[in-house]
Amino acid sequence: MYRSFGKRLFDLLVCLPIVLAVSPVLLLAAALVKLESRGPVFFVQERLGRYGRTFLTYKFRTMTHRKREATAEILPGHSEVTRSGHWLRRFKIDEFPQLLNILNGDMSLVGPRPALPDHINEYNEDGLKRLLERPGMTGLSQVSGNIYLSWPDRWFYDAQYVKRLSLLKDATIIIKTVAVVLLGEERFLKKPHADPEQTSETEAANSGPHDHRHAA
């Protein structure tokens, strides 16, 4: 019931008040991006959605405006991240425009993070399972270490989320996300304990795609 109908209703009931509450923050962030560097306010990129359908995600631009490889790895302290971009990334404010993706049904508040289309070629069985639900602004892997996890570990968490999806699980992840934003992802690093039959597959797939926290 929750998976087929309640989750979408939950997204709308929670997302609409959030959009109204953070509107001043969105306007301030847009102004900072525009004033600090030349280029568009938003970074727009094609990502994988439910059942492998592609859609456009929106984020506040946090880097200097120039062409770069789509899979270039961008870590904290990167020289091309702007001053305002550093703070937008630190407190995840750069992700706020994805609230619009949630309202139009491309994303959910909670779910596997939307991946680049090219990454589907790297997926193991867990990676493919993450495509069974709408991608989320936050998810189980994001509150379990995120960039400090290997790709197979992230996919494992995503697959576990899809398997055990519930209202309580979504509410718990949202609450944990607040703690992660305030305290940092590294403090919440938690290595998954895979089922024995999954171990060999996970080890074989341990060289997943590069991290895609880039050009945002």
Question: What kind of region is each of these model predictions?
Answer:
Residues M1-C15, V44-Q45, L140-Q142, N146-L167, ...:
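Glycine-rich flexible loop motifs, especially short His-Gly-Gly/GGXG/HXGH segments used as catalytic or interaction
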Residues M1-H65, T172-A216:
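A hydrophobic, helix-centered structural microdomain
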Residues S4, G52, R83, Q98, ...:
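Amphipathic alpha-helical recognition patches that constitute DNA-binding helices
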Residues C15, A30, F43, T82-H86, ...:
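Positions in alpha-helical segments
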Residues A29, V44, A72, V110-P112, ...:
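Short, hydrophobic secondary-structure boundary micro-motifs
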Residues K34-L35, R90, I102, N146:
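Conserved catalytic core of Hanks-type protein kinase domains
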Residues F43-E80, T138-F156:
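Short, glycine-rich, amphipathic interfacial segments at transmembrane boundaries or analogous
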Residues P76-R134, I174-T177:
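A short, structured surface patch at a secondary-structure boundary
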